């Protein structure tokens, strides 16, 4: 099962993430948990989230990039749900062998994230990659949709279909 942990603080204003979710919903075996809809008060149901994670083979952290990082509710979710003794540490093997895909949208172009005036995309992914590895997850190459503020509808739809294709290819490779 593919579990998408969706963290968009303003989901009604989303163009790119909305299309990505629409494409993902067309696949069988996909569950989407929208953190800002489930927990508008930031009071996360840890047991429910851990139960959802336990059913997943592929976990996707999908969100818009905010200030070169993740939205605050996703950070809190990571801090609370990936707990010691469950996700890491003594006895913390619940996520071992599962896969993690970081699916992120950005307003800037891909070149905006090259080494130079701004941090490189590989650098920006390191905290998430380190978290994944620490929890025994297999880190997959990220999926990034850039220039979302200026893309036309056709481009956004094409990128969303590419996202669906990434998920489908993972399903086919791991479940025949």
Swiss-Prot record:
It comes from the Bacteria. It is a peripheral membrane protein. FMN binds at residues 8, 14-17, 65-68, 105-108. Homodimer. Interacts with KefC. Regulatory subunit of a potassium efflux system that confers protection against electrophiles. Required for full activity of KefC. Shows redox enzymatic activity, but this enzymatic activity is not required for activation of KefC. NCBIfam families: PRK00871.1 (NF002044). This is Glutathione-regulated potassium-efflux system ancillary protein KefF. The gene is kefF.
């Amino acid at each position: 099962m593919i579990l998408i942990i969706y963290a968009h603080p303003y989901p009604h204003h989303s163009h790119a993430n909305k299309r990505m979710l629409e494409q993902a919903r067309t696949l069988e075996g996909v569950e989407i948990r929208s953190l800002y809809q489930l927990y508008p008060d930031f009071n996360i149901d840890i047991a429910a989230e851990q139960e959802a994670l336990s059913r997943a083979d592929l976990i996707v952290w999908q969100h818009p990039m905010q200030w070169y990082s993740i939205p605050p509710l996703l950070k809190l979710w990571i801090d609370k749900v990936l707990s010691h003794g469950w996700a890491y540490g003594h006895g913390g093997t619940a996520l071992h062998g599962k896969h993690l895909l970081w699916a992120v949208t950005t307003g800037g172009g891909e070149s905006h994230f090259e080494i130079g005036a701004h941090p490189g995309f590989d650098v920006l992914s390191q905290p998430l990659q380190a978290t994944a590895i620490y929890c025994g997850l297999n880190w997959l190459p990220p999926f990034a949709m850039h220039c979302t503020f200026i893309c036309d509808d056709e481009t956004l739809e094409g990128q969303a279909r590419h996202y669906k294709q990434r998920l489908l290819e993972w399903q086919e490779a791991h479940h025949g």
